[in-house]
């Protein structure tokens, strides 16, 4: 199963980068597969660590896609990284292995520590649709224009029916 998250990584100068990521999780391992080239890829190779943030706040996903990544964040204790101040929880992960691939290498990460901040309050179709729209926007170079417009048209139905004020 793919879980939509916000992954934060840092470069060697401790500048943080936030990216929306569909990660895979199995037991105590998390699999992160960034595209080549990407800042997440460069940072994971350089620092061998990341923070996986769990949130249903779609504004994080939208703002990452449009390049507005000035989020409220906190420094992790005893770990090189930052987590989103407003998330359900997060996991600090360390890269243990890299599976090479020409398009999307996979970083096999071990969970160092998990943190719970607040409770998840349930699923919302509008939020899921907005996250799906962000995924489409991040793949404009891979998908046809008509396919994207068709998908967005369908997704807008759930947003119109179930959105709150934030969506």
Predicted region positions:
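Basic, polyanion-binding surface patches
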Residues: 1-90, 94-167
């Amino acid at each position: 199963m793919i879980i939509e998250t916000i992954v934060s990584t840092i470069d060697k100068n401790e500048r943080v980068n936030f990216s929306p990521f569909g990660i895979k999780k199995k037991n105590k391992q998390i699999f992160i597969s960034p595209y080549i080239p990407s800042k997440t890829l460069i940072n994971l190779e350089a620092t061998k660590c990341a923070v996986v943030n769990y949130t249903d706040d779609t504004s994080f996903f939208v703002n990452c896609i449009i390049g507005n990544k000035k989020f409220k964040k906190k420094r992790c204790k005893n770990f090189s990284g930052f987590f989103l101040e407003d998330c359900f929880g997060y996991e600090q992960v360390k890269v243990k292995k890299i599976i090479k691939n020409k398009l999307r290498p996979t970083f096999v990460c071990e969970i160092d520590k998990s943190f719970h901040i607040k409770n998840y309050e349930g699923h919302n179709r509008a939020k899921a649709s907005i996250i799906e729209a962000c995924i489409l926007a991040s793949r404009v170079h891979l998908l046809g224009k008509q396919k994207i417009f068709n998908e967005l048209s369908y997704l807008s139905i759930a947003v119109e029916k179930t959105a709150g004020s934030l969506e």
